Amino acid sequence: MAAAMAEQEGSKGSARNRGGVQRVEGKLRASVEKGDYYEAHQMYRTLFFRYMSQSKHIEARELMYSGALLFFSHSQQNSAADLSMLVLESLEKHEVKVTEELLENLAKLFSLMDPNSPERVAFVSRALKWSSGGSGKFGHQKLHQFLAITLWKEQNYYESRYHFLHSSDGEGCANMLVEYSSTRGYRSEVDMFVAQAVLQFLCLKNKTSASVVFTTYTQKHPSIERGPPFVQPLLNFIWFLLLAVEGGKLTVFTVLCEQYQPSLKRDPMYNEYLDRIGQLFFGLPPKQSSSYGGLLGNLLNSLMGSGEDDDVEDGQEDSSPIELD
């Protein structure tokens, strides 16, 4: 009986709090609609810190989120970006569990920010760090997918590609690469767009996405004749490589790399990626010294990460940032 009464009182208190927040939101919205942007912005900040000090983290976060959307709708980029950062602050300090709804909200804020603003860079960095849940991995795959799609819509293919590589959306990545290659690439390099993506997915131990991106890209690209086999030797190599990875036979992998050296020499990074793939899927030992030092070595290390734990689910290992060359 007592427990039921306490629960009922708690529900009433929660309803009162929500009603109070809605009234405050109404007043703030009216200020923004009148064009009192500065005053409204300062009031949002004051309420945020008040709610946070009272441990009303959810109310604080929801108020900042709705406020940011409101400022974005009135083209007040600076105020909107500031409130977006406060949304992140509430998530960081409250140690909130990562949910798809929260990731969608963060992606929504990201999509509304000025693509060229430094605030957007800072926002996405913090959002990815929070979404990793303290695991040390570089962001939640779903958030990377949302970001990749937004950047693709903005025709920022370079950055979109980076985030697709850290997602599990091989099909989306392939469709983006088809558009990227068709609008920005040379016809003679249609095979290289997908080859690099497949090799990098494999270096991240994401066999599933590597296979999906290859199949989807080769089926949908208007300049690629239906295969296999393909007209382009590099595409045949990638096709055989994916089969070899599934089979796990070192001799097949070794012969394959030897036979296709002319195609692999088109990009100096291919053999570096294949060295790592040999370690991950065929039991080859790491090379004592890389044939590429300096910048290329650093690019490869950042792609592959330093993790050596092979008992990891597909696509979940080596989630450190990928430098795209």
Swiss-Prot record:
Transmembrane segments: none annotated. Gene3D superfamilies: Tetratricopeptide repeat domain. Residues 1-22, 306-325 are annotated as: Disordered. Residues 307-317 have a biased composition (Acidic residues). One of its GO terms (cellular component) is BAT3 complex. The keyword Coiled coil does not apply. GO terms for biological process: protein insertion into ER membrane; tail-anchored membrane protein insertion into ER membrane. It is found in: Cytoplasm, Cytosol. Keywords: Cytoplasm, Transport. Pfam families: GET4. Disulfide bonds: none annotated. Its main location: cytoplasm. InterPro entries: GET4, TPR-like_helical_dom_sf. As part of a cytosolic protein quality control complex, the bag6/bat3 complex, maintains misfolded and hydrophobic patches-containing proteins in a soluble state and participates in their proper delivery to the endoplasmic reticulum or alternatively can promote their sorting to the proteasome where they undergo degradation. The bag6/bat3 complex is involved in the post-translational delivery of tail-anchored/type II transmembrane proteins to the endoplasmic reticulum membrane. Component of the bag6/bat3 complex. Belongs to the GET4 family. This is Golgi to ER traffic protein 4 homolog A. It comes from Xenopus laevis. The lineage of its organism: Eukaryota, Metazoa, Chordata, Craniata, Vertebrata. The gene is get4-a.
